[in-house]
Amino acid sequence: MSRIGNRELKIPVGLEVTIQPNNVIVKGVKGQLEQTIPSVITVVAKEGVVTTTRANDVKHSKQLHGTINSLIQGMLEGVSKGFKKELEINGVGYRAALVGDKLTLSLGYSHPVEYKIPQGITITLPKPTQIIVEGISKQLVGEVAANIRNYRKPEPYKGKGVKYKNEHIIRKEGKSAGK
């Protein structure tokens, strides 16, 4: 029995949840999100609560049950509050700049790295070494932050690279001199 799938999700005030045969649409203050629902999962919204049920007890149905419930919870939170990921850039000469709808990163390569910002995402730079990724879709915010981090992951010796704000990098000791 999926405990996550059986959760009742409270609909915050000011949000509108529309359920179609294979779709759930959530409209809120920050925008609108849409999620396709598999045929084995049934979503019901009434009296300010969203519930999900599955048609059978096949393993795949059980897996989808919890996943869809969590995705809908993320949608409810996203259109009401939004999501935010913060990244930090460490390293001499490493910095970021916004040029139109592109994020330009100087990360020690022979050329600047340009990242096109997708629709529905806002990126702000309080400092040239700090990037804030914001949006209503939890999946998209996480994906954009991961893509930016992948351009130069933090290395274990000096910690240079792009890391999440509260990420702890396990450091290694360098080569020791001869005896």
UniProtKB/Swiss-Prot annotation:
Transmembrane region(s): none
GO molecular function: rRNA binding; structural constituent of ribosome
Record keywords, A-Z: Ribonucleoprotein, Ribosomal protein, RNA-binding, rRNA-binding
Classification via InterPro entries: Ribosomal_uL6-like, Ribosomal_uL6-like_a/b-dom_sf, Ribosomal_uL6_a/b-dom, Ribosomal_uL6_bac-type, Ribosomal_uL6_CS
Coiled-coil segments on the chain, per record: none
Cross-referenced Gene3D superfamilies: Ribosomal protein L6, alpha-beta domain
GO cellular component: cytosolic large ribosomal subunit
Origin: domain of life: Bacteria
Keyword Cytoplasm: no
Any one Gene Ontology BP term: cytoplasmic translation
Family: Belongs to the universal ribosomal protein uL6 family.
The protein's assembly and partners: Part of the 50S ribosomal subunit.
Protein task: This protein binds to the 23S rRNA, and is important in its secondary structure. It is located near the subunit interface in the base of the L7/L12 stalk, and near the tRNA binding site of the peptidyltransferase center.
UniProt-listed HAMAP family: Ribosomal_uL6_B
Protein name in UniProt: Large ribosomal subunit protein uL6
Organism taxonomic ancestry: Bacteria, Bacillati, Mycoplasmatota, Mollicutes, Entomoplasmatales
